[in-house]
């Protein structure tokens, strides 16, 4: 019988042989888009802090003040004593931003999706997922016990055909997608998805983790499709808003049920006061500075034009390399030039589609974007 350590070591060896082993690398972000690794300063194009708010003086001051008033942690589940006043204030602000009736805040985006889906789907139901949906959407569907049916990426015809085949035999149906896809940067056709859902009595879930704060003056991807009906608007506080946590915006009835039945809310400690206060301060900035929210996409589009890629739809630009080792080599070559662009490999992306995932911030200097484009252009031409 193999020991536990032998089992782990064997798996690590196989992953390393396939260039798929991942390791943590201590990284210090002191301010802006400059990070330090192994004593060397690099310009990062791998951070999701799209607006640079994680180090904004007003955001940091709000977090510090919240600690002074409420303490470092929430101390308990929200249903016990962890529902500090900042959480209801944050929920009201998020609901207003997303044009929803109500909102509930979770400890993270992952917890939001893995709490949401099992609350509204179970045995006898179906969950149809975009094949490229985020891992936490898949995890939530798996936890639910519902039948999981993937549909081809952004293919509403395929979705409609699957619903025509399976909807009548299911009690309820959820259709789940990213609003902005985290590895490809493209946007879901929420208007068409909504129409298909309405025609087939299905509930649409959109994960807008990478859209809020940077699209439609900060309102996110759903605001690009004002006619779309999206009963579940999920998102995070950890990217453009520079803090931490997740949320679901929905009707009051949906939110009330989540607050009493979502296991990841009921059995998790409430979001710390500092994180909630930081997110509130970030929302103030997003609402007051629409020009700031437009910068990440503008910089991404300047880059795609420079390297000969189609115009970016979001601040995320993938440069497909192919094999995992080749993507690692490309990342190391850019690091040697002073840029941190992390290689994304399977299983995060499909086999043969390892890539450089380039994330643009409002704080990236235009001259450095141009220099990065010069270095990346040969990889684009090679495809």
From Swiss-Prot:
Pfam families reported for this sequence: Aminotran_1_2
Names of required cofactors: pyridoxal 5'-phosphate
Keyword Transferase: yes
Family matches, as SUPFAM superfamilies: PLP-dependent transferases (SSF53383)
Keyword Transferase: yes
Catalyzed reactions per annotation: 6-carboxyhexanoyl-[ACP] + L-alanine + H(+) = (8S)-8-amino-7-oxononanoate + holo-[ACP] + CO2
EC number: 2.3.1.47
Coiled coil: none
Binding-site residues for pyridoxal 5'-phosphate, renumbered to this chain: 109-110, 182, 207-210, 236-239
Signal peptide: none
N6-(pyridoxal phosphate)lysine sites (modified residues): 239
Keywords: Biotin biosynthesis, Pyridoxal phosphate, Transferase
Protein family membership: Belongs to the class-II pyridoxal-phosphate-dependent aminotransferase family. BioF subfamily.
Subunit: Homodimer.
Functional summary from the UniProt entry: Catalyzes the decarboxylative condensation of pimeloyl-[acyl-carrier protein] and L-alanine to produce 8-amino-7-oxononanoate (AON), [acyl-carrier protein], and carbon dioxide.
Record's protein name: Putative 8-amino-7-oxononanoate synthase
Originating species: Caulobacter sp. (strain K31)
